[in-house]
């Protein structure tokens, strides 16, 4: 309600040119909820229309100009006063003057660079948005519209498997192997665990997917670890020579691509955490970083078929006893209270 003439004398609305046909995707908001936003990719044009609707048609509205901005910005939650803009484009839509009726203004930002993927995390948010502003002497009228940006990658040229022998001296030696070190977000992790020596009573084994978000620089660095998935490999005691297969489907989890040193503000990395628990509830673990990437939506074989092919290839490899042994074994770390 306008009081003594103060308050918004007009409303702004932003509509995209291809809003009827453009794909929408769910994206997590700062409060943890999911909402749908229009999806864009790097290099795509962003165009549309800003409509100024007068609250009192027929009554003239003075203004100091109308503009539209396209902004990409990073906000660190511990430094909320500062917004770090890495993309900032502006177009003037109307010169200072008067409006006597509601009016629409077209805009176009051609082939816009959108270098990073949209991200909402524990301590940081990277967002892209359009902001229309009608400048007035007392109170500006503004309207924002968020969009989501995905960054696509091509298949990595080098994607070697991960093989490592780990253990506790004279107590436990295992070899774990994952078929790749880089996985797309709908991929399947195929692997196996091979027990070379078992002299302690293991009662449970699992693989966790851990997301590690790092924000800030220098003394102001914050780390947040989030366990995205827990995959039980084994429930019960293993024996020497036993081989346990792993098939972990990534499509069911809330994952993002790996992000490294984004605008020198934050990173998001993913780790496979192999966890063993003995009968005395002692926990041993070994972490291995993997790289996650997003590929375009193309026609592909079903996930189950994809997993079957990968596991057939994988299970066709020889056992560790028939392969050259590794030069050394890494130690399993014990988790302390």
UniProtKB/Swiss-Prot annotation:
Signal peptide: none annotated. It is found in: Cytoplasm; Membrane; Endosome. Its main location: cytoplasm. The keyword Membrane applies. One of its GO terms (cellular component) is retromer complex. One of its GO terms (biological process) is intracellular protein transport. InterPro entries: Arrestin-like_C, Vps26-related. It holds the Pfam family Vps26. Transmembrane segments: none annotated. Residues 313-337 are annotated as: Disordered. Keywords: Cytoplasm, Endosome, Membrane, Protein transport, Transport. It is a peripheral membrane protein. The keyword Cell division does not apply. Acts as a component of the retromer cargo-selective complex (CSC). The CSC is believed to be the core functional component of retromer or respective retromer complex variants acting to prevent missorting of selected transmembrane cargo proteins into the lysosomal degradation pathway. Retromer mediates retrograde transport of cargo proteins from endosomes to the trans-Golgi network (TGN). Belongs to the VPS26 family. Component of the heterotrimeric retromer cargo-selective complex (CSC) which is believed to associate with variable sorting nexins to form functionally distinct retromer complex variants. PANTHER family: VACUOLAR PROTEIN SORTING 26 RELATED. This is Vacuolar protein sorting-associated protein 26B-B. It comes from Xenopus laevis.
């Amino acid at each position: 309600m306008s009081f003594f003439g103060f308050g918004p004398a007009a409303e702004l609305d932003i509509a995209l040119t291809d809003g009827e046909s453009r794909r929408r995707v769910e994206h997590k908001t700062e409060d943890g909820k999911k909402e749908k936003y229009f999806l864009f990719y790097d290099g795509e044009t962003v165009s549309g229309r800003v409509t100024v609707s007068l609250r009192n048609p027929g009554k003239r509205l003075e203004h100091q100009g109308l503009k539209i901005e396209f902004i990409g910005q990073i906000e660190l939650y511990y430094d909320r006063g500062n917004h770090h803009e890495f993309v900032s484009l502006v177009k003037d839509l109307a010169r200072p003057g008067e409006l006597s009726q509601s009016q629409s203004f077209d805009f176009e930002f051609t082939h816009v660079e959108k270098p990073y993927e949209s991200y909402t995390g524990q301590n940081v948010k990277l967002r892209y948005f359009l902001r229309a502003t009608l400048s007035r002497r007392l109170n500006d009228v503004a309207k924002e519209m968020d969009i989501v940006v995905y960054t696509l990658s091509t298949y990595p040229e080098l994607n070697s498997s991960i093989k490592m022998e780990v253990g506790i001296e004279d107590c436990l030696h295992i070899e774990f192997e994952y078929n790749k070190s880089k996985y797309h977000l709908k991929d399947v992790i195929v692997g196996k665990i091979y027990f070379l020596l078992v002299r302690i009573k293991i009662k449970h084994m699992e693989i966790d997917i851990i997301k590690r978000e790092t924000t800030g620089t220098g003394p102001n660095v914050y780390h947040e670890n989030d366990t995205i998935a827990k995959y039980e490999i084994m429930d019960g005691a293993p024996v020497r020579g036993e081989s346990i297969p792993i098939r972990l489907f990534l499509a069911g989890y809330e994952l993002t691509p790996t992000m490294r040193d984004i605008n020198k503000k934050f990173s998001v990395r993913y780790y496979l955490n192999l966890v063993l628990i003995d009968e005395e509830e002692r926990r041993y673990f070994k972490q291995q970083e993997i790289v996650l990437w997003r590929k375009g939506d193309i026609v592909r074989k079903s996930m189950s078929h994809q997993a079957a092919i990968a596991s057939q290839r994988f299970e066709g490899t020889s056992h560790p006893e028939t392969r050259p042994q590794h030069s050394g074994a890494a130690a399993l770390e014990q988790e302390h209270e």
